[in-house]
C-alpha cells in the first residue's frame, strides 16, 4: 500500500520507540509547538501529562525546543481567555515541572487563505517550521469524531476562525446576473470586494459575514454553505501548510463526546494504544480502522455523522489517507 507509515504502540515504551523512528533530528535547533487539548473542566478524559512529557523529552533529545500549546475557545467559560486556560492546564497537571517545558496558550492569529477561505492560524503555529500534534481520539456530535484533523482544524485557529469553521459559508458571485451596482462593495465591512476592474473578492479579507449577499438586489450573490467536516479539513490544512509535522493519536478513554464537553458521556470502545505518523489524514484513518475492529461504526451509530467525511475532504486538499501500519 502506498502512503505513509503509521506506527502502532501499545504502551509508553512503544510511543518512545515510534518517536525514535520518526526522524525528530530534523527538529534540532527549532521551536516545536506540541499542539494538544489540555482538558475542559469536568471532563476527565484529556491527554495524560505523562504522555506529553514523553513527547517533550523526545523532542529535547533530538535538539528541539518544545512547548505545549493550545488556543482559547470561542464559547463562554474558563478556557475562553488565556489566564483562565492556564489555570485549567495547571489543575490538570500540565506544568513546566511535570511536562518539562513551557505551557503556552494562544489568543492571536495570522490571516491566511486556504481553499479560498480566509482563516486566522494561531500565531505560534504559523511562525513554527515544525510541530507535533498530540490528539485524543473520541466522538464528536457534529463532526462524527475528533482526531488530528479536528485538533488542528478547531484548536489551531483564533476564536473568530473557530466560529467561522462551525458556520462555514463562502459568498459566491454569478457574473451573468451581476449589474456591477456596487451595493455589495458598500455593504462589506471588511473591504473585501471591488468592481473597478470587474467584480473581485479578496478571500484574505472576507469574513463570511453575509452582508454582501443580503445587500444584493439581483440575486447575483449567494452563500455556498460548507459542512463542518470540510471546514475542519480546510482549517487543519491552513495550520500545517508547508510545515514538518509529527502526529500522535491516543486511542485511550475513547469517549462518546468531545474533550470540550464537560459531560462527555461514556467510554464507547476499549483502550487500544497509540499511533504515531506523518500525515493527519492517515493517522485519523488508522485510528478509525482500529476502533472499527473493536466497536464497528460506533461513532456513526452514536452521532449519525460519518466520521470519515473530514478525512475525505482532507485528501481533496492534499493529505493522504493511505498508510501502512507498523507495530513497535
Which residues are covered by each model-predicted region?
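N-terminal and secondary-structure boundary signal
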Residues: 1-328
Amino acid at each position: 500500500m502506498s502512503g505513509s507509515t503509521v506506527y502502532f504502540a501499545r504502551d509508553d515504551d512503544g510511543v518512545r520507540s515510534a518517536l525514535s523512528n520518526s526522524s525528530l533530528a530534523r527538529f534540532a535547533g527549532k521551536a516545536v509547538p506540541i499542539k494538544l487539548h489540555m482538558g475542559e473542566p469536568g471532563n476527565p478524559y484529556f491527554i495524560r501529562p505523562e504522555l506529553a512529557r514523553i513527547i517533550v523529552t523526545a523532542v529535547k533529545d533530538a535538539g528541539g525546543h518544545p512547548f505545549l500549546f493550545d488556543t482559547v475557545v470561542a464559547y463562554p467559560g474558563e478556557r475562553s481567555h488565556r489566564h483562565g486556560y492556564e489555570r485549567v492546564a495547571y489543575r490538570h497537571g500540565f506544568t513546566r515541572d511535570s511536562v518539562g517545558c513551557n505551557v503556552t496558550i494562544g489568543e492571536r492569529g495570522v490571516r491566511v487563505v486556504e481553499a479560498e477561505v480566509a482563516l486566522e492560524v494561531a500565531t505560534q503555529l504559523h511562525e513554527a517550521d515544525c510541530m507535533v500534534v498530540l490528539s485524543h481520539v473520541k466522538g464528536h456530535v457534529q463532526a462524527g469524531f475528533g482526531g488530528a484533523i479536528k485538533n488542528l482544524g478547531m484548536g489551531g485557529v483564533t476564536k473568530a476562525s473557530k466560529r467561522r469553521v462551525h458556520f462555514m459559508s463562502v459568498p459566491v458571485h454569478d457574473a451573468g446576473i451581476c449589474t456591477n451596482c456596487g451595493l455589495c462593495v458598500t455593504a462589506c465591512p471588511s473591504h473585501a470586494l471591488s468592481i473597478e476592474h470587474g467584480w473581485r473578492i479578496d478571500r484574505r479579507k472576507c469574513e463570511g459575514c453575509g452582508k454582501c449577499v443580503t445587500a444584493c438586489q439581483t440575486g447575483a450573490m449567494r452563500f455556498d454553505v460548507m459542512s463542518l467536516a470540510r471546514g475542519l479539513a480546510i482549517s487543519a490544512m491552513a495550520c500545517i501548510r508547508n510545515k514538518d509535522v509529527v502526529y500522535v493519536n491516543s486511542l485511550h478513554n475513547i469517549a462518546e463526546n468531545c474533550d470540550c464537553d464537560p459531560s462527555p458521556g461514556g467510554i464507547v470502545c476499549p483502550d487500544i494504544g497509540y499511533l504515531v505518523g506523518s500525515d493527519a489524514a492517515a493517522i485519523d484513518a488508522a485510528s478509525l480502522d482500529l476502533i472499527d475492529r473493536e466497536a464497528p461504526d460506533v461513532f456513526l451509530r452514536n452521532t449519525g455523522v460519518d466520521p470519515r467525511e473530514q478525512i475525505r475532504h482532507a485528501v481533496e486538499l492534499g493529505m493522504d489517507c493511505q498508510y501502512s501500519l507498523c507495530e513497535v
